[in-house]
């Protein structure tokens, strides 16, 4: 067997997972994390088929049952691949795979038993061992051998038994399964969602071309791999295969699109990273210093959530720290190791790539990347280029306007992964498959997919530049409170794009890929709709003409004015109109895909000599066929005779059965017939018909070439179209934020200050809880007052479930909304600009990293203390609860004391169930202040514990009782247990109170002797916990 190639273990991993009892079915979306090591090219695949036995599912469909279209093959589509279907032969059971008594034989002595198609498969497979191959055979796609076993299991389709391995000859054919070609897209996505790489091999010649041009007229059809896909690189390409009438807009592809990562960890702390998103063309790079726990890497993985990761380093394997972190974030990601090479290799390859792609069109970009980016970014870049070449996507790096830095400290802040998760920015943590209850769920009212993607970026990276924040806020005010005909018309255009499910951003990048590599990633209809959307928008802007400037006098937002001004300038150009004039939109209404191709171009504006030449040849042949028809009319004495078409067979002469048929020349060929008539072609018609088919097929080829040339023209104007998309996306995001303040009542524009850290809000509300509540009127609002000058640290106590966590999350969410440029739920607000927001909240452990709850708690605190600034907002929830009470109090006190005395002086909200920490208010008056969540205690008889009514309002003071027994009651703990606990709690409290004088004297002695401050704090906690 051939040596292992890139990614090969992704297939062997599937068999391994089967033998280790991982069961896959049609509802599975991924399998466990897969590490692919490319350093050992000689290692062979170990698929462990001995442990895998295919068991047909009762619901599995046979290959013929799947072909619901029941299309009937014409002679034009016949093939001579020698791949017989088991029609009359009784199929063997799956057990026959293992029970066959035939002995394995050598390849050389048995290769003659393979059909021509199977030999072709073996040749393809030997050079593509890392892929599942789907091979086109007529109107079907077939999987053979190991590929068939995997495909049949995932797709729940029948497996026809046979040989599994390439060098196995126990049976007279390979095991196989098949799917109809018009269902390829659907089945392909299911395979890709299992983390597999799939190659699609198509027939590259037709019967007509083969019969005239081919040197081997009776041999095998030529096939080649026309597309290779993974989950991140597939963009609905194969929707073009099969049924031309399929409604592409009715099939929802992943709207956001997966990222592909490359990380250079050659230097353990100085890490370089590039992430590309094929569906949009986004390229995100970053360099950062990281620690052993890979906190910075985790943040980037959480934000971008890649499905494929390449890791470069100087070792023979990926570092344990990186592997652990990747598996924590996503244990289903495919991971590929790349050994680091000499830097000169990367430099030379970058130069070579840009000098050769598109005939040197982008040769200057090599110098640009080498001068602008450090070595560890250059290495990531070239490894991604090499990786993407197989998918024909590496020209993504030719669009430098799509390149951005992940952490741009001058314009935005990056929320740490712990903050993103704690605040549920993008995902509801109780239901990871839903975003309901997340910040994106609240703010996302975008009309288009491109607007949706941009809004996600806005939310993930709040602004730290006051001018940019104010521009967005003013834009929302203009859109919310002022009616404008121009703005209303532009809104309607976005609505049309959204309702039609047209993804301008995705389709434009597909044009770019296709123009360079001559791919079929985008259909003619998609191209037309793309241009038509641009034309409608620019034409609408033109219709306003000169009065546009007067209309925009009511707009005060510099951001909106820039958007409209740039769109007006772009509307003056005739680029879109010229491109639309070259095509005929009426052709797209034709249900026949080939007719669409032939009629697509308006040859008056798009002059292609090859198309014109083939059309002329076709016209000549059709004229000769008409001449032949005249001669046949004379011969048969039927002046009204015409050619007919039957079962897709054209140019047939229909004759009644009987004497008329008997009188025909013997060299006439019968094509088909019925009981009453027979249909023939004369030798001359047969000859001309073959010529006509040949020229028609050549015309289709030339139309495809012309279409690629047309895509190249569009791609030459990529930046023009990209500017339109960027402006429309920004406008869509502003409309979305405007909708938030319109749909929800009592939202206010925050006053942004940059000279001091402050959060002052009157009657503020948690925007998520407010929208999830059934009765809005019952929601309790709270004031927020925290600033650098006064009450910089809030120490918050109160009963369990009293609303402490909800309150501090509310503070963080409102700050983020303000810095996004959104209105916020309150009467009025003044907010400073924060460059970082750190949150340590919740109890969780990490088995993968052998880390306990307390270890994670301390690691996150350590990260916060190291990275905070004087412009940070810090929220700490119940620090110290992951360990014993004594150590927990000491840790909580020390951390809080450090945050108060630290010269960087961040604003801090500190939730605790250790009421003894309230002493810090006396120690640091005006800096630290005690607050608690309001409640009302309802006393009962001495035998029962008091009930608590939560008021959910923040009030001054400290609370010593957490009222945990009330939570136990809500959880359904039996009353007898709760009453017993209350009795015990009362006894302990009475014992402590009776011992108070002795404890006080001991504490004073301890202080006089200057013992450890921790002794003091522990004594205070134990004595005051029940006395306060």
Swiss-Prot record:
Biased composition (Basic and acidic residues): 41-56, 67-88
Comp. bias intervals (Polar residues): 93-113
Principal location: nucleus
Any Gene Ontology CC annotation: MutSbeta complex
Location(s) in or outside the cell: Nucleus
One Pfam family of this chain: MutS_II
Recorded superkingdom: Eukaryota
GO biological process: gene conversion at mating-type locus; maintenance of DNA repeat elements; meiotic mismatch repair; reciprocal meiotic recombination; removal of nonhomologous ends; replication fork arrest
Keyword Heme: no
Record-linked Gene3D superfamilies: 1.10.1420.10, DNA repair protein MutS, domain I, MutS, connector domain, P-loop containing nucleotide triphosphate hydrolases
Stretches with biased composition (Low complexity): 10-23
A GO molecular-function annotation: Y-form DNA binding
Region of interest: Disordered: 1-114
Region (Mispair-binding domain) location: 109-232
Similarity section: Belongs to the DNA mismatch repair MutS family. MSH3 subfamily.
NCBIfam families (alphabetical): PRK05399.1
Name of the protein described by the UniProt record: DNA mismatch repair protein MSH3
Species this protein is from: Debaryomyces hansenii (strain ATCC 36239 / CBS 767 / BCRC 21394 / JCM 1990 / NBRC 0083 / IGC 2968) (Yeast)
């Amino acid at each position: 067997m051939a040596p292992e190639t890139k990614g090969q273990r992704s297939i062997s991993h599937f068999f391994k997972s089967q033998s280790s009892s991982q069961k896959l079915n049609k509802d599975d979306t991924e399998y466990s994390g897969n590490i692919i090591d490319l350093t050992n090219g000689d290692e062979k695949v170990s698929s462990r088929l001995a442990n895998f036995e295919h068991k047909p599912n009762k619901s599995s469909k046979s290959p013929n049952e799947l072909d619901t279209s029941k299309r009937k093959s014409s002679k034009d589509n016949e093939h001579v691949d020698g791949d017989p279907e088991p029609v009359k032969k009784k199929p063997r059971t799956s057990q026959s795979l293992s029970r066959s008594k035939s002995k394995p034989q050598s390849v050389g002595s048995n290769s003659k038993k393979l059909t021509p198609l199977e030999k072709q498969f073996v040749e393809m497979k030997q050079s593509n061992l890392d892929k599942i191959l789907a091979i086109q055979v007529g109107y079907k796609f077939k999987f053979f051998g190991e590929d068939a076993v995997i495909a049949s299991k995932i797709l729940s389709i029948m497996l026809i038994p046979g040989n599994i391995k390439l060098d196995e000859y126990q049976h007279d054919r390979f095991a196989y399964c098949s799917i109809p070609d018009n269902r390829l897209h659907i089945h392909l996505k299911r395979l890709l969602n299992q983390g597999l790489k799939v190659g699609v091999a198509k027939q590259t010649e037709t019967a007509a071309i083969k019969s005239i041009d081919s040197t081997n007229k009776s041999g095998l059809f030529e096939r080649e791999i026309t597309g290779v896909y993974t989950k991140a690189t597939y963009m609905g390409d194969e929707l073009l295969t099969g049924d031309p009438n399929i409604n592409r807009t009715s099939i929802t592809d992943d709207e956001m699109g997966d990222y592909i990562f490359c990380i250079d960890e050659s230097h353990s702390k100085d890490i370089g990273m590039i992430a590309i998103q094929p569906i949009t063309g986004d390229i995100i790079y970053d360099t950062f210093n990281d620690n052993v726990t890979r906190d910075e890497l985790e943040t980037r993985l959480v934000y971008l959530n890649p499905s494929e990761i390449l890791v470069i380093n100087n070792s023979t394997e990926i570092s344990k720290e990186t592997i652990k972190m990747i598996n924590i974030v996503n244990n289903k990601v495919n991971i590929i190791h790349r050994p680091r090479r000499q830097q000169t290799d990367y430099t030379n390859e970058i130069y070579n790539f840009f000098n050769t792609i598109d005939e040197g069109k982008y040769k200057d970009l090599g110098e640009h990347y080498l001068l602008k980016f450090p070595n560890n970014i250059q290495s990531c870049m070239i490894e991604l280029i090499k990786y993407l070449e197989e998918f024909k996507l590496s020209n993504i790096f030719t669009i430098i306007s799509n390149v951005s830095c992940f952490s741009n400290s001058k314009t935005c802040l990056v929320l740490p992964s712990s903050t993103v998760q704690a605040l549920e920015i993008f995902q509801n943590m109780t239901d990871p498959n839903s975003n309901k209850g997340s910040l994106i769920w609240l703010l996302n009212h975008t009309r288009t997919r491109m607007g949706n993607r941009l809004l996600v970026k806005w939310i993930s990276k709040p602004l730290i530049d006051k001018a940019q924040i104010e521009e967005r806020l003013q834009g929302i005010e203009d859109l919310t409170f002022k009616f404008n005909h121009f703005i209303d018309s532009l809104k309607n255009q976005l609505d049309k794009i959204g309702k039609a499910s047209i993804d301008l951003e995705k389709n434009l990048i597909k044009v770019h890929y296709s123009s360079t590599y001559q791919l079929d990633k985008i259909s003619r209809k998609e191209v037309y709709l793309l241009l038509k959307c641009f034309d409608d928008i620019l034409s609408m802007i033109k219709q306003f003409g000169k009065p546009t400037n007067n209309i925009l006098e009511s707009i005060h937002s510099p951001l909106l004015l820039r958007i409209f001004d740039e769109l007006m300038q772009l509307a003056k150009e005739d680029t879109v109109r010229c491109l639309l004039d070259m095509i005929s939109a009426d052709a797209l209404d034709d249900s026949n895909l080939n007719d669409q191709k032939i009629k697509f171009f308006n040859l008056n504006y798009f002059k292609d000599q090859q198309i014109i030449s083939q059309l002329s040849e076709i016209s000549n042949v059709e004229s000769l066929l008409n001449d032949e028809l005249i001669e046949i009319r004379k011969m048969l004495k039927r002046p009204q005779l015409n050619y007919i078409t039957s079962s897709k067979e054209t140019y047939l002469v229909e004759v009644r059965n009987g004497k008329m048929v008997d009188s025909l020349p013997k060299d006439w060929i019968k094509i088909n017939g019925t009981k009453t008539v027979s249909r023939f072609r004369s030798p001359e018609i047969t000859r001309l018909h073959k010529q006509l088919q040949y020229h028609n097929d050549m015309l289709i080829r030339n139309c495809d070439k012309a279409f690629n040339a047309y895509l190249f023209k569009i791609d030459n104007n990529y930046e023009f179209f990209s500017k339109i998309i960027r402006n429309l996306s920004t406008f869509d995001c502003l409309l979305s934020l405007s909708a938030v303040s319109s749909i929800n009542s009592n939202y206010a524009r925050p006053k942004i200050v940059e000279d001091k850290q402050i959060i002052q809000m009157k009657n503020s509300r948690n925007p998520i809880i407010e929208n999830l509540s059934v009765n809005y009127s019952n929601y309790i609002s709270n004031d927020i007052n925290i600033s650098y000058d006064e009450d910089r640290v809030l120490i918050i106590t109160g009963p369990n479930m009293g609303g402490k966590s909800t309150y501090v999350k509310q503070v963080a969410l409102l700050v983020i909304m303000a810095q996004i440029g959104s209105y916020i739920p309150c009467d009025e607000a003044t907010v400073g600009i924060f460059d970082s927001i750190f949150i340590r909240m919740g109890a969780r452990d990490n088995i993968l990293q052998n880390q306990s709850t307390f270890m994670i708690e301390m690691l996150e605190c350590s990260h916060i203390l190291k990275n905070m600034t004087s412009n940070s907002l810090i929220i700490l929830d119940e620090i110290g609860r992951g360990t014993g009470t004594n150590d927990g109090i000491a840790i909580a006190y020390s951390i809080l004391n450090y945050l108060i005395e630290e010269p960087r002086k961040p604003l801090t909200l500190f939730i605790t169930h250790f009421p003894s920490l309230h002493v810090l208010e006396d120690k640091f008056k005006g800096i630290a202040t005690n607050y608690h969540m309001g409640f009302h205690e309802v006393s009962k008889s001495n035998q029962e514990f008091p009930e608590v009514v939560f008021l959910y309002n923040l009030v001054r003071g400290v609370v010593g009782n957490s009222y945990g027994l009330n939570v136990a009651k809500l959880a359904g703990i039996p009353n007898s247990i709760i009453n017993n606990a209350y009795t015990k709690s009362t006894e302990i409290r009475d014992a402590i109170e009776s011992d108070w004088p002795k404890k006080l004297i001991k504490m004073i002695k301890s202080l006089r002797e200057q013992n450890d401050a921790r002794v003091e704090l522990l004594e205070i906690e134990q004595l005051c916990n029940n006395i306060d």
